[in-house]
Amino acid sequence: MAPTLQGQWIKVGQKGGTGPGPRSSHGIAAVGDKLYSFGGELTPNKHIDKDLYVFDFNTQTWSIAQPKGDAPTVSCLGVRMVAVGTKIYIFGGRDENRNFENFRSYDTVTSEWTFLTKLDEVGGPEARTFHSMASDENHVYVFGGVSKGGTMNTPTRFRTIEAYNIADGKWAQLPDPGDNFEKRGGAGFAVVQGKIWVVYGFATSIVPGGKDDYESNAVQFYDPASKKWTEVETTGAKPSARSVFAHAVVGKYIIIFAGEVWPDLNGHYGPGTLSNEGYALDTETLVWEKLGEEGAPAIPRGWTAYTAATVDGKNGLLMHGGKLPTNERTDDLYFYAVNSA
């Protein structure tokens, strides 16, 4: 039986210019016919640069945006970014010396950076890496990730959502999901028809003394209208537990691809066991479907940069780079174009 969600994989050509090259643990966001890329690593836990790369879908060429305004001061890995309208927002990330970036926006019309929030201030969100970001028309959301830590405390994971109100420039933490909710990094995180979904991720046990650092297959959503969290049971072609996978929303579907399905004994320094499978979750029926494999990336990968995008009039999942089973990084640019949803 053919899946309900029909689409096709397209390897996007990159015809030159100065681009990000092979990397992982970076962030991308799409605005109009441009793709923006920031941060990342080529070797484990070593930053590369703090340039903002711009890909033009019309010419299929890369360039570097000139750093006008309050540009990022830290070369980041484990950073995330999202787009709202014509602005992109970056949050967190760190360099190899554990200097952490803050929260900034970049106006794609004026090509100017704006400093918005210093992280780790009292009453505001904490600095972090390997978190997840999502957005709607009025908010930027940050979920999970790994804390900064320090000389007196060990880095830990988060389980809460931080919400930034774009209109008034203020942060608020949404209701805590409670002790039965795993703290996670590298989770799927998406706004679908007004609800905020958390899908899978790399988890810390909810049982005192239990096993930490494992792949989760939990799926929950937060409803801003009722201010309540709900954990759901999904069915169908359910993917195995995983983290650091590419994902995007198209209609009522959360599309995911690849990711780490088993952690490496050397932690982030190794590749882990990676996937090259794609799935779509219908958030109304809670049924998973497996995506078609024709044209999909043949080599498994994780820690890709990802975003929802519209390319040639079709909505879908766009992803760049990632870590391969050889522990090398790739600079592939792939788009899963949805034909029907």
UniProtKB/Swiss-Prot annotation:
Reported impact of residue 300 to N: Strongly reduced activity
Name of protein: N-(sulfonatooxy)alkenimidothioic acid sulfate-lyase (epithionitrile-forming)
Effect of residue 130 to A: Lost activity
BP GO annotations: defense response to bacterium; glucosinolate catabolic process; leaf senescence; nitrile biosynthetic process; response to jasmonic acid
SUPFAM superfamilies in UniProt: Kelch motif
GO cellular component, one term: cytoplasm
UniProt-reported outcome of changing residue 46 to A: Reduced activity. Strongly reduced activity. Reduced activity
Positions of Kelch repeats: 34-82, 87-133, 139-194, 203-249
Entry binding sites for a (Z)-N-(sulfonatooxy)alkanimidothioate: 46, 94, 129-130, 157, 186, 211, 244, 303
Phenotypic consequence of gene deletion: Accelerated leaf senescence and increased pathogen damages.
Subcellular location: Cytoplasm; Nucleus
Subunit description: Homodimer. Interacts with WRKY53.
Stretches the record annotates as Disordered: 1-24
